[in-house]
Amino acid sequence: MGNFLLVHGAWCGGWVWRKVADRLRSFGHNVYTPSLSGMGDRSHLLSANISLQTHIEDIFNIVEFERLTNVVLVAHSYGGMVATGVADRIPDKIDALIYLNAALPQNGQAMLDLISDKRKNTVIRLAEQEGAGVGIPSSLIMETGIEDDREHAEFMSRTCLCL
């Protein structure tokens, strides 16, 4: 079956893919849902040294160390930045690249280049005020798309600073 590598977005971790991963596994696929450095269950690693390049390396290493080929790389939100970098680095190992409400950068663009100047200024200000200049606080989450109140509360309780 297929090798699915699911890349989460900002403020969360690999846990966000649990239901999707369970469903894909029920069809016999191999599914990987890593948390990016400094996020999710790896939030204790958050530091000023973590960057988009670190996150690209996180996902690249999954492909390399698991010796994956024919990968279906699925990205959500900020994960689109990461997946784009990975796909550029190892295009021969990626069968499909799926952007699920994800950032779709052009070469050389940063995440902040994809948002309005007003939002960019807010992000920078809050990162300095609430994120010690290192991370972006989850107070910036505008919409989760989760309609069930209990699931929304569960999601928000697990959010963390992101880069």
Name the predicted role of every residue range.
Residues 2-43:
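Conserved HGGG/HGGXW glycine-rich cap/lid loop of the alpha/beta-hydrolase fold
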Residues 3, 30, 70, 93-96:
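Structural signature of beta-strand start/N-cap positions in the alpha/beta core
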Residues 7-10, 76-77, 102:
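Glycine-rich His-Gly loop
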Residues 19, 85-89:
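Active-site signature of alpha/beta-hydrolase-fold catalytic machinery across serine-
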Residues 30-32, 38-72, 88-89, 112-116:
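Active-site loop/oxyanion-hole signature of alpha/beta-hydrolase fold enzymes
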Residues 74-79, 83:
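Gly/Ala-rich beta-loop-alpha elbow adjacent to hydrolase catalytic centers
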Residues 88-138:
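Flexible "cap/lid" loop of the alpha/beta hydrolase fold
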Residues 131-163:
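Conserved alpha/beta-hydrolase catalytic His-Asp/Glu region
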